[in-house]
């Protein structure tokens, strides 16, 4: 199934909110491709692309990650940020949301707080678990390459310009976000490489 969305999905009233059945236009049961009005890809769905072996190998570590939570993903969680209440009862200036089961694995780029690239804690503290994800990550990369070869090539070129210590070997990726049993709110990811494409 391929479909061109002629109208832009409105941000107002949706961003940060939860999906509702009334928002649905199509029920997709097989492979599908949706494109924006400008012809660029919005969504490519490939069912059954990952081998059972890679999925089964990765599952225990991915399941273990459900205990990793964040209180900093308001749009993703579908809940507004509020001031944190400290243990002593005082209101903090720090804005948080209720914890959602999400974490990042792979490698972080530089930021103001950390002016250097680095491994995520899960990579450095759980190298065996990280190793079990590698076949799955490589298979997702190959699905991406087959579905959107130009986007894959652009992302791969950017990865090759990055120090190899901070690229997931054999892929054009540096980082994975693992959202575990969380119903996402409408949101736009930040930090994605715009010439590439996000793979879920």
State where each predicted segment sits.
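Fe(II)/2-oxoglutarate oxygenase catalytic core
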Residues: 1-199
